[in-house]
């Protein structure tokens, strides 16, 4: 049985980790931390978990208790894992970080986007970017895994087949993405209030979103060179979901794009390439660790449109983290993650 610790268990990604781990036959949560809710029972805060974690309480982070775990997940704001990851790694504990702390390979670039110096630059070289569809073999050997963000997951999975094949003009990529309100986190913010977010949609961070350098980094790896990406995120009046509409110029009209995508993801358990002409919906992935993709070439022209949908809290966060854990410990990748999406 894998002994699991969770740092920062009171947010949406933390409770989603708990929900998924409750169904995992090879993992047991030993420690869950929260400075603000120390002493509170998990089931008192999240009654949906009654019957699964009745004796588990939030506690103040204790590196000795966490270091006794086989793996520790960080479901925290950026900066927290910087302070604790090194000590846990020294104790022999694997670290899976759901925050942005180790996603970018360049410490200076991280500092520019997050407004503070990187707190553990020495760990960046060994941190493995946890997108299984790209880095599965590296994940198997990792000590420290950086779980991709939600927008980066949907965008990269949608564009990677075109870039790896050298078909798309990498200098003219567009990612037009929509997110549910849970992507903003559980903290109280005016923009997340029902009366503010309901029955409305808005673009934000057009000048530059923190996920932009992460997406660009992944697309550079796929293309083997520089990329030009315009990324525009939007807030939509739904709770869960990411819908990415991706645009790429592909001059070669002889390529069977449907076959290209199907071949690229043929052996990926959590990527579903839908039939030609499909329009995937966010509700089709709600609660499931899956990315559904459809590829279009409107009017047979040079512009290719890829539609990519995920649940931002599952394949975009906690589900992908658990997928990484399964790979890391040599388990079936699908363990604890095979449930269907919730409808309606």
Swiss-Prot record:
It is an enzyme of class 1 (oxidoreductase). It is found in: Cytoplasm. One of its GO terms (cellular component) is cytoplasm. GO terms for biological process: L-arginine biosynthetic process. Its EC number is 1.2.1.38. SUPFAM superfamilies: Glyceraldehyde-3-phosphate dehydrogenase-like, C-terminal domain, NAD(P)-binding Rossmann-fold domains. Pathway: Amino-acid biosynthesis; L-arginine biosynthesis; N(2)-acetyl-L-ornithine from L-glutamate: step 3/4. It catalyses: N-acetyl-L-glutamate 5-semialdehyde + phosphate + NADP(+) = N-acetyl-L-glutamyl 5-phosphate + NADPH + H(+). Keywords: Amino-acid biosynthesis, Arginine biosynthesis, Cytoplasm, NADP, Oxidoreductase. The active site is at 150. SMART domains: Semialdhyde_dh. It comes from the Bacteria. GO terms for molecular function: N-acetyl-gamma-glutamyl-phosphate reductase activity; NAD binding; NADP+ binding. PROSITE patterns: ARGC. Catalyzes the NADPH-dependent reduction of N-acetyl-5-glutamyl phosphate to yield N-acetyl-L-glutamate 5-semialdehyde. Belongs to the NAGSA dehydrogenase family. Type 1 subfamily. PANTHER family: N-ACETYL-GAMMA-GLUTAMYL-PHOSPHATE REDUCTASE, CHLOROPLASTIC-RELATED (PTHR32338:SF10), N-ACETYL-GAMMA-GLUTAMYL-PHOSPHATE REDUCTASE, CHLOROPLASTIC-RELATED-RELATED (PTHR32338). This is N-acetyl-gamma-glutamyl-phosphate reductase. It comes from Pseudomonas paraeruginosa (strain DSM 24068 / PA7). The gene is argC.
């Amino acid at each position: 049985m894998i002994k699991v610790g969770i740092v920062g268990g009171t947010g949406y990604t933390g409770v989603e980790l708990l929900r998924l781990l409750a169904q995992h036959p090879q993992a047991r949560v030993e420690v869950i931390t929260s400075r603000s809710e120390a002493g509170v029972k998990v089931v008192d805060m999240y009654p949906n978990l009654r019957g699964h974690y009745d004796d588990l309480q939030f506690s103040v982070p204790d590196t000795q208790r966490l270091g006794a775990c086989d793996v520790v997940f960080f479901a925290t704001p950026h900066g927290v894992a910087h302070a604790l990851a090194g000590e846990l790694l020294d104790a022999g504990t694997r670290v899976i970080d759901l925050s942005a702390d180790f996603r970018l390979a360049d410490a200076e670039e991280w500092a520019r986007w997050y407004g503070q110096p990187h707190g553990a630059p020495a760990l960046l070289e060994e941190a493995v970017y946890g997108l299984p569809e790209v880095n599965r073999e590296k994940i198997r050997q990792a000590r420290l895994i950086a779980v991709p963000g939600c927008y980066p997951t949907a965008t990269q999975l949608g564009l990677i087949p075109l870039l790896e094949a050298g078909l798309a003009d990498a200098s003219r990529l567009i990612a037009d993405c929509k997110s549910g309100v849970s992507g903003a986190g559980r903290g109280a913010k005016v923009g997340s209030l029902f009366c503010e977010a309901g029955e409305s949609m808005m673009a934000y961070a057009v000048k530059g979103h923190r996920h932009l350098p992460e997406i660009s980094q992944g697309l550079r790896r796929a293309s083997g060179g520089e990329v030009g990406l315009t990324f525009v995120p939007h807030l939509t009046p739904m709770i869960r979901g990411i819908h990415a509409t991706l645009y790429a110029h592909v001059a070669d009209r002889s390529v069977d794009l449907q076959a290209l995508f199907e071949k690229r993801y043929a052996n990926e358990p959590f990527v579903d390439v839908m039939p030609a002409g499909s329009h995937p919906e966010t509700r089709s992935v709600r609660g499931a660790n899956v990315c559904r993709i459809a590829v279009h070439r409107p009017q047979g022209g040079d512009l290719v449109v890829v539609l990519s949908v995920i649940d931002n809290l599952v394949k975009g966060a906690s589900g992908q983290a658990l997928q990484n854990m399964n790979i890391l410990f040599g388990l079936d990748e699908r363990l604890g993650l095979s449930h269907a999406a919730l409808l309606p």
